[in-house]
Curated annotation (Swiss-Prot):
Subcellular location: Secreted
Lineage of the species this protein comes from: Eukaryota, Metazoa, Chordata, Craniata, Vertebrata
Source organism superkingdom: Eukaryota
Keyword Translocase belongs to the record: no
Organism this protein belongs to: Pleuronectes platessa
Main location: secreted
Name this protein carries in UniProt: Serum amyloid P-component
Subunit structure: Homopentamer. Pentraxin (or pentaxin) have a discoid arrangement of 5 non-covalently bound subunits.
Residues covered by the Pentraxin (PTX) domain: 1-20
UniProt key word S-adenosyl-L-methionine: no
Keywords: Amyloid, Lectin, Secreted
Gene Ontology CC terms, in alphabetical order: extracellular region
Length: 20
């Protein structure tokens, strides 16, 4: 499920970089 993975990565990236 690439979509689920993308969503997880997006959330993870947002949590890591709250500046963006």
């Amino acid at each position: 499920z690439p979509i689920d993975l993308m969503g997880k990565v997006f959330v993870f990236d947002k949590e890591l970089s709250p500046b963006i």
